[in-house]
Design a protein with these regions (language model features):
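Acidic (Asp/Glu)-rich catalytic clusters
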Residues: 90, 230-231, 334-339
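Acidic/aromatic-lined carbohydrate-recognition and catalytic surfaces
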Residues: 32-223, 231, 238, 242-298
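Structural preference for long, well-ordered alpha-helical segments in enzyme cores
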Residues: 86, 369-372
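Glycan-recognition surfaces
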Residues: 185, 262-357, 371
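Active-site rim elements
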Residues: 242-246, 355-364, 370
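Sec-dependent N-terminal signal peptides of Gram-positive bacterial secreted proteins and lipoproteins
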Residues: 15-35
């Protein structure tokens, strides 16, 4: 069993309702106000309804399987290695796991998906994944997986079929699943499609051709993919690059999220969906109109986010009070767009710098930051 010394593992912070914070504060204040005249024999009545937190309010541990825990000595982390560390994750207080992409891919990060219905052989098999879900259920750990809907790999059968048809001057349903244009468009994000006269759009990298999420046949296929994983026991999805579904068009992006959220909830009502909309506060907040459960709160994460600047006291406005005010304002804003919104604050993830560097390796600050 090989356990890597440098793990690519990060935390998606716990999500708390404002009411819970107020209840805790009220309890503390009432305790301070006691004058000692009451005794246990006097008794107290509690007539309020139980404040049961929704099952989707959890603390998630992000796992990059590739470098987490290697069970077979091949130098690459795998699902069986992750299973062996579930007690460790649970003991730390996490009741949710977010898996970065686990589907077949040509890259180490696996955000260029080849096949949406299987597991990358470096990580294991579908049977291994089923066992992971089974073991997580025993520990009340909910598993969500990264689902990349913005693009695929150029090695996807969808894309290869589309390019082959264009080269032969034939028709194919897969052509409509991507964004193709004849000739070379002015934008740098377009690349030649094989030996054809067509180019395909790929904003991130030429190995990741963008999908056309307005295509109804593609949407039907995506629904099949979502149902496949939900039926396997997945608790939900982390939606990658949701801001880029239609770059520069938030209305269309919100429509895509609404469609996907509505479908997933129709299959599994309690599934949890969180989207990556890497943008400023006012811009990403509007995406809650889609009805999605959560959006990553980028205004609180990263080296420049509210958590880091507060703990580093970076400026006169970064006090504990200003942090509390910002937290309440954020949650009120999210709830104004979606009354069932769940804030998803995070401190750092695979796209940002390492947390230790934010505080000059001050262990106390790092621990407090995770708690915030």
């Amino acid at each position: 069993m090989l356990i890597f010394k440098r793990w690519r593992v990060f935390v998606l912070g716990s999500k708390l309702k404002i009411s819970v914070i107020f209840v805790v504060l009220a309890l503390l204040l009432s305790a301070c106000a006691q004058n000692g005249s009451k005794t246990a024999s006097d008794g107290y009545k509690y007539n309020h309804e139980l404040n049961v937190i929704d099952d989707n309010y959890r603390t998630y541990y992000e796992v990059f399987v590739y470098s987490f825990c290697d069970s077979n000595g091949d130098g690459i982390g795998d699902l069986n290695g992750l299973i062996s560390k579930l007690d460790y994750i649970s003991d730390m207080g996490f009741n949710g796991i977010w898996l970065m992409p686990i589907m077949p891919s040509t890259t180490y990060h696996k955000y260029d998906v080849i096949d949406y219905y299987s597991i990358d052989k470096q990580y294991g098999t579908l049977d291994d994944f089923k066992r992971l879900i089974e073991e997580c259920n025993k520990r009340d750990i909910k598993v969500i997986i990264d689902l990349v809907l913005n693009h695929t790999s150029t090695q996807s059968e969808w894309f290869k079929s589309a390019v082959s048809a264009l080269e032969k001057g034939q028709d194919s349903k897969y052509i409509g699943w991507y964004n193709f244009q004849k000739g070379k468009p002015a934008s740098d994000a377009w690349y030649k499609a094989g030996n054809s006269e067509w180019c395909y759009e790929a904003k991130f990298w030429e190995g990741m051709p963008d999908l056309n999420l307005g295509n109804e046949e593609l949407r039907a296929e995506i629904e099949k993919i979502a149902k496949f994983w939900l039926d396997l026991g997945v608790g939900g999805f982390r939606l990658d690059a949701a801001k880029e579904y239609y770059s520069g068009n938030s209305e269309k992006n919100i429509e895509v999220l609404k469609w996907f959220t509505d479908y997933c909830k129709s299959v599994k009502k309690d599934c949890y969906l969180v989207a990556e909309v890497w943008d400023g506060f006012s811009a990403f907040s509007k995406y809650y109109q889609s009805g999605i459960d959560s959006l990553f709160n980028f205004s609180f994460g990263q080296a420049t986010g509210k958590i880091t600047t507060t703990l580093n006291m970076a400026g006169s406005t970064n006090s504990a009070k200003s942090y509390a005010d910002a937290l309440c304002f954020a949650q009120k804003t999210f709830l104004s767009y979606n009354p069932n919104a769940i804030d998803a604050p995070f401190f750092t993830n695979h796209d940002t710098g390492r947390a230790a560097g934010y505080f000059s390796y001050n262990a106390d600050k790092i621990k407090l930051a995770w708690g915030m």
